[in-house]
From Swiss-Prot:
The active site is at S138 (for autocatalytic cleavage activity), K175 (for autocatalytic cleavage activity). Represses a number of genes involved in the response to DNA damage (SOS response), including recA and lexA. In the presence of single-stranded DNA, RecA interacts with LexA causing an autocatalytic cleavage which disrupts the DNA-binding part of LexA, leading to derepression of the SOS regulon and eventually DNA repair. It comes from the Bacteria. The gene is lexA. This is LexA repressor. Belongs to the peptidase S24 family. NCBIfam families: lexA. The keyword DNA-binding applies. Gene3D superfamilies: Umud Fragment, subunit A, Winged helix-like DNA-binding domain superfamily/Winged helix DNA-binding domain. PANTHER family: LEXA REPRESSOR, LEXA REPRESSOR-RELATED. It catalyses: Hydrolysis of Ala-|-Gly bond in repressor LexA. CDD domains: S24_LexA-like. It comes from Ruminiclostridium cellulolyticum (strain ATCC 35319 / DSM 5812 / JCM 6584 / H10).
Length: 215
């Protein structure tokens, strides 16, 4: 059983380092589950804790959401060679993925968060941020496609031309923001779609600062 546990730890560590090496950020717990064949995220958390205890991964105790991958080879078993390792010293942060948005409720309320998306701290720009998965093709001309993840910096105001996530009723929408004479225009970046004109104040949840796509 100990050997089996060690093999699984190695498999997880190799997968994490492979993702960091290829993508610049580690996989989510759900992605690790799928990659190594686990059904429960709690099992993955248990194995990750073992890797932390062994010094392969490290969490920053002052930043509950941050994880730092140590600058060393992915070597759990003694018979692994250095050439099989991947290297990184970038500090990571788990950005919450928001599944739904409800008027009058904080965007990062626990019940709204469906997953986390690990990113280098410098991507987040030292600000509160969240991820939202895009549904539809209203922003394709801006390079934001259906099922992409947008990285959103929380803020309640915007400048003309900013791509924002705004709340209209109970629906979050991603559009380009324009404040005009007596209304706000939320412009889709798709020539086949009409803008949304809002005459009352709307709630801006944040500005889009990044786009991520799973191939």
């Amino acid at each position: 059983m100990a050997k089996k546990n060690s093999n699984k730890q190695q498999e997880i560590l190799d997968y994490v380092y492979k993702c960091v090496h290829e993508n610049g950020y580690p996989p989510s717990v759900r992605e690790i589950c799928s990659a190594v064949g686990f059904k429960s995220t709690s099992t993955v958390h248990s194995y990750l804790q073992k890797l932390i205890d062994k010094g392969h991964l490290q969490k920053d105790p002052t930043k509950p959401r941050a994880i730092k991958i140590l600058n060393k080879t992915s070597q759990v078993q003694e018979n692994r060679t250095n050439k099989e390792g991947y290297y990184t010293s970038r500090e990571m942060v788990d950005v919450p993925v928001v599944g739904r948005v409800t008027a009058g409720q904080p965007i990062l309320a626990v019940e709204n968060i469906t997953d986390t998306f690990p990113l280098p701290v410098d991507f987040v720009q030292n600000s509160d941020a969240f991820m939202l998965r895009i549904q539809g093709e209203s922003m394709i001309d801006a390079g934001i496609l259906d099922k992409d993840f947008v990285l959103v910096r929380q803020q309640s105001s915007a400048n003309n031309g900013d791509i924002v996530v705004a709340l209209i009723g109970d629906e979050a929408t991603c559009k380009t923001f324009y404040r005009e004479k007596d209304h706000i225009r939320l412009q889709p970046q798709n020539s086949s779609m009409e803008p949304i004109v809002v005459k009352d104040e709307l709630s801006i949840l944040g500005k889009v600062i990044g786009v991520f796509r799973r191939m």
